[in-house]
Regions:
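Acidic, glycine-rich A-domain
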Residues: 7-159
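Residues that scaffold, gate, or flank divalent-cation-dependent active/transport sites
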Residues: 4
Length: 159
């Protein structure tokens, strides 16, 4: 789970924490937790309670999604059994070319890339729709979902 903690995600912190919590509680998954702004922080040692962890850590600042996904790519051992879950508004500060390049690399490895877009406190989607369309065109699953919708989607994917 790769969670955008940049300044633009401030209104989505609660949503992001709940979404990360859904994946962390799935017993069939070995879950890693990575947060990022322009820096990447691996919080995999705190994945048992991602809601508390994400609510207590707020990085803020800029956004380097490509850098975070590049780090996550190094964690992939078995691509065909790997879900890379990105929770972000997809507003990339480090250049969209790099974001698309690393996303394509993850997808072409056989791993599944899931981009869960930001929802604010009223569940209104707030994300870069062009970036979302580009990722979807590459084969990533891109969705603006409530936690209930996500739980159903993940159950269908892994079940």
């Amino acid at each position: 789970i790769c969670v955008d903690e940049s300044g633009s995600m401030l209104d989505s912190v609660i949503h992001s924490a709940i979404m990360a919590g859904i994946f962390a509680r799935l017993p069939m998954l070995d879950t890693r937790l990575v947060i990022f702004d322009t820096n990447v922080v691996d919080l995999s040692g705190h994945v048992e309670d991602p809601v508390e962890t994400l609510m207590s850590v707020q990085l803020g600042g800029g956004t380097n999604i490509a850098g975070a996904l590049s780090y996550c790519e190094t964690l992939i051992d078995n691509p065909h059994r790997t879900l890379v879950v990105l929770i972000s508004d997809l507003y990339e500060g480090g250049g969209y070319h790099n974001l698309y390049s690393v996303s394509r690399s993850i997808i072409e490895s056989g791993a599944r890339l899931i981009a869960l877009t930001a929802l604010d406190m009223t569940a209104t989607p707030n994300y870069d729709r062009h970036a979302a369309a580009q990722l979807a065109q590459m084969g990533a699953f891109v969705g603006a979902m409530t936690p209930e919708q996500l739980a159903e989607h993940v159950a269908d994917m892994v079940g």
